[in-house]
Amino acid sequence: MNKSTSSLDYIEKLPLPAEQAEVLREKLPQAAWNDQAVLHQALSEGSQPEGNQVNVQAEDDVALHSVQARLEMAWADGLDNGKQLGTDREGRAALKAMPVITRASMFPDVWRTNPLIRWWESLLGRTVPPRPHYSPEEKISENRWRLVGTIRRYILLALTLFQTAIATWYMKTILPYQGWALIDPFEMAGQPWTRSLMQLLPYVLQSGILVLFAVLFCWVSAGFWTALMGFLQLLIGRDKYSISSTTVGDEALNPEHRTALIMPICNEDVERVFAGLRATYESVEATGNLEHFDIYVLSDSNDPDICVAEQKAWMELCRDVGGAGRIFYRRRRRRVKRKSGNIDDFCRRWGNQYSYMVILDADSVMSGECLTSLVRLMEANPNAGIIQSSPKASGMDTLYARCQQFATRVYGPLFTAGLHFWQLGESHYWGHNAIIRVKPFIEHCALAPLPGEGSFAGAILSHDFVEAALMRRAGWGVWIAYDLPGSYEELPPNLLDELKRDRRWCHGNLMNFRLFLVKGMHPVHRAVFLTGVMSYLSAPLWFMFLVLSTALQVVHTLMEPQYFLQPRQLFPVWPQWRPELAIALFSTTLVLLFLPKLLSVILVWAKGAKEYGGAFRVFLSLLLEMLFSVLLAPVRMLFHTVFVVSAFLGWSVQWNSPQRDDDATPWSEAFVRHGSQLILGLVWAIGMAWLDLRFLWWLSPIVFSLILSPVVSVYSSRAALGLGCKRAKLLLIPEEFNPPRELVATDEYCRLNHQRRLDDGFMQAVFDPSVNALASAMATARHRFSRAIEDVREQNVREALNRKPEEVSNNQRLALLSDPVTISRMHYHVWQKPEAYAAWVEFYQKLPAPHIKS
């Protein structure tokens, strides 16, 4: 970039055919080759409507004149013949990235978690019953399935408690110290307290073991019966109460009921996000029902480079599919309440323009048939508030992700169908790949912060379970369409990335349990809060169970036994050990844990195993996944234990988006994260080997998994091993054997997007004419003239340019990007006076040119 020919260099950066570029050069007198004002005036000729000139407040605002012209040069096909371009009140060019706002009121109710206050208010008649929103016929239908659901859940409770009672009794009989025969209270009264403590210690340990065993076995038992009923449901193939059976599947969509597909994102993989979005859009278009849908990308990204890359990817998507006026993009400047706040903001501004909304995750892909089916189900069931699809995991290559994909694809349908069997219309909502009725969501599902102070107060982290509970509290059904195909998601590529996500989920579920006693919550959703807590609390309970079992073994081995407790006692009192009952209980527990997996494979065999690699390979995959789960279970146990403890201690939880792409774990990070587990495993194993080698064999699956945790974490994160399994047709899933067109298209568009990806987006927005025009037209801080605002703008631009680019903070960059005036002034200065800002020019010249296709 040369000062004397800066305008000519600028023209070379414009995406113009050679002939048009030459015409533009000829327009400029040689004396004006270094005058950016003349260049931008020449560019803007004919692009600004008469009487609609930019209100220029300073000499360096001249780049604002040519924003529209530069946009039309770069993305003319994405502007819908100029219909997507407009101007703000100061005449500056602005892209219509979002529709006109039609505000709706959405405010939360204060949480009332004190049961005594609730009881007092009920005595005063202050309880508000759910508003009736359905006809008498619909009420009869709902009462029918609610009665069936209640009966089923009582059966589940009875089966679980009965099974747990028997197992706990067995556990009691196999523990060595039966009854209190070895304790003589009168003797203990006259002996030192330390001796009494040693006599009581085995019984205290046994009691703790028994309580923990009962809780953990009850948790395992509930999962077993859920999977078993799901197996029977899928094997029979008919479900009288399946919500999917309420439509034929070819009904015309009601034109009065429009649907918004909304995708909240935050610092995600831009190329993958917009590839999946394009595949979903084209699939909807192929159904012939595109006019019923709009798409919203709702960004909470705070990385300036990613923000600019999102804007460019959105514009390219609109151009590629002709989606102008149907695909919208918004980036929030005030990130309030994370994802739930982002959705709430959409509902307040544009929600009342739609009857339904479908929530998508950044890695979600949905077929047009699935989306139109969800809309038909909503129209056929006017008392349904949320219908959750069952997303299938796919698209990953690492060994870890492929094991998880296989597990969720093979075992997941059993548990999802089982959940539906027990819950019916009072079910789960997982926060994505689900359709929501917008009006009741606005009226009932705004989330107030939890009252109080500490780590369990403030904004709700895991909003999905709470929103489902509030929807049901208002009288609307929450269903799982477990048998609806065409819904897909991706999983974290390695163990450490999954655990980052689990830490946030753990904290969120523990927070949600504060709502267990909130007024009006349905018992099923109180149980959902409880199961959410147990998903993570079971880890420290299991760890405590192992610690107490180890301590009991230490006491039993090292403490000198007393067989004669009284003078002249004829027969000794022996501690009891019944190995046959121990083996029976151990075998029963293994059956509860692994039978659902075997039933899943039996179901695959019954339905056809070809898409899983064949009957033999699917069985080998089962064994491989079981080995993998055995190795990882103790590792997750310790991590989840730390998460639970840290949540109670108030340690902060960062809002980090999970990694969405294949990513190998380096050895250094593995030893940092798993080093303490390796040491614990070694100490535990050596101690048990010295104490009693027989007990080490029982403990070996735990301790050796901990010792091997760094190795397993690293090698399972390798894509080479995962792809090797894929070539051997191991851990194969139907989406790989016969890929749906949506997933094929997603991979294709992902490769295309990577070819034209935008790196260092902020620097490109400062220098590149096309990217700068886009950033300026999409900036949202469009203030009227004010001297105070002008002073702030001048200060922001001056401070940024007087530093090196790498010294400008993210917050400063975001402030510059958010104002069309400041980003245009930056653009003008670096081109008008390149010698004054050599550090910026030098940085920019090292960057690859952005891919701009006119």
UniProtKB/Swiss-Prot annotation:
Q: Which residues cross the membrane?
A: 155-175, 209-229, 528-548, 583-603, 619-639, 671-691, 695-715
Q: What Enzyme Commission number(s) appear in the record?
A: 2.4.1.-
Annotated compartments: Cell inner membrane
Q: What's its top-level EC category?
A: transferase
Q: InterPro entries annotated for this entry? A: Glucans_biosynth_gluTrFase_H, Glyco_trans_2-like, Glycosyltr_2/OpgH_subfam, Nucleotide-diphossugar_trans
Q: Which UniProt keywords apply?
A: Cell inner membrane, Cell membrane, Glycosyltransferase, Membrane, Transferase, Transmembrane, Transmembrane helix
GO CC terms of this entry: plasma membrane
The protein's annotated pathway: Glycan metabolism; osmoregulated periplasmic glucan (OPG) biosynthesis
Does this entry carry the keyword Transmembrane helix? yes
Q: Does the keyword rRNA-binding apply?
A: no
Tell me how this protein sits in the membrane.
Answer: Multi-pass membrane protein
Task: Show the GO MF annotations.
Answer: hexosyltransferase activity
Q: Name one GO biological process term.
A: glucan biosynthetic process
Q: What is the recorded function of this protein according to its Swiss-Prot or TrEMBL entry?
A: Involved in the biosynthesis of osmoregulated periplasmic glucans (OPGs).
What is stated as this protein's family in its record?
Belongs to the glycosyltransferase 2 family. OpgH subfamily.
Name of the protein described by the UniProt record: Glucans biosynthesis glucosyltransferase H
The lineage is: Bacteria, Pseudomonadati, Pseudomonadota, Gammaproteobacteria, Enterobacterales
Gene that encodes the chain: mdoH
